[in-house]
A protein has these predicted regions:
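Long, contiguous binding/interaction regions
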Residues: 1-224
Length: 224
């Protein structure tokens, strides 16, 4: 009830993703997410929204759309017929808020730092590169201020790295930044990342021809 911050949120847990990594199908992950969603709603009296591959309707697939209004606005949003929760009560939990549960592809959290303290520029670049603004498919982005460093950041979530590569987000951000006379001063990956996403990016910048994951030593060892 007293939390503040730059990143959108609608609950204490906020989101629970089910990600098929190995020896499991997306269909199995979807079924499990729905089973857990029903149990969470019942056991904890918590409104549950199914999202991404588990979504019960197209307008619920995008987590940003589900989160819109955030914790403070969810009490009114949840009253709308199109935003009734899939499981649980029809009003937010007093302290836990609401939660989104669903199956999805591995998400790559990728941030690009800009040599400007102007947050409006970071916001504008984010709007240009994200899919909802006419940019890259499977790309979500927002501008963030890094006060301690005196710079800003384009914070990106790549929701399907197999369809839209990391280097495309990096290069499009570079192009848009030039329009403001701004440069990229670094980037970072938050959390875990699939090896394939990094190999794909390295292959692009090195100009490798006919390269495949089968040539990666660690990948071959793991297969054994």
């Amino acid at each position: 009830n007293h939390h503040t911050g730059q990143h959108p949120r609608m609950g204490a847990v906020d989101v629970v993703p089910f990600i098929p990594i190995k020896n499991v199908t997306m269909e199995e992950a979807i079924a499990l997410s729905k089973e857990v969603g029903a149990e969470v709603g019942k056991r904890y009296n918590l409104p549950v929204f199914l999202y991404e591959k588990s979504a019960s309707a197209p307008h619920r697939e995008n987590l940003a759309a589900v989160r819109k209004g955030e914790f403070e606005g969810m009490a009114e949003k949840i009253k709308l017929p199109e935003w009734q929760p899939d499981f649980g009560p029809t009003e937010p939990h007093a302290t836990a808020g609401t939660v989104a549960i669903g199956a999805r592809m591995p998400l790559v959290a990728y941030n690009i730092n800009l040599n400007t303290p102007n947050l409006d520029i970071a916001h504008d670049i984010a709007k240009k590169i994200r899919f909802i603004g006419g940019g890259l498919r499977y790309c979500k982005a927002m501008g963030v201020e890094l006060k301690d460093r005196g710079i800003t950041q384009v914070s990106i979530n790549m929701t399907d790295y197999t369809r839209t590569a990391l280097y495309r987000a990096f290069e499009l951000t570079r192009v848009e930044a030039r329009r403001y006379g701004v440069s990229i001063v670094g980037s970072e990956i938050i959390g875990l990342v699939p090896m394939e996403a990094l190999i794909d990016t390295a292959s692009y910048y090195l100009g490798l021809e006919n390269f495949s994951m089968q040539q990666v030593l660690e990948a071959r060892i793991m297969e054994e």
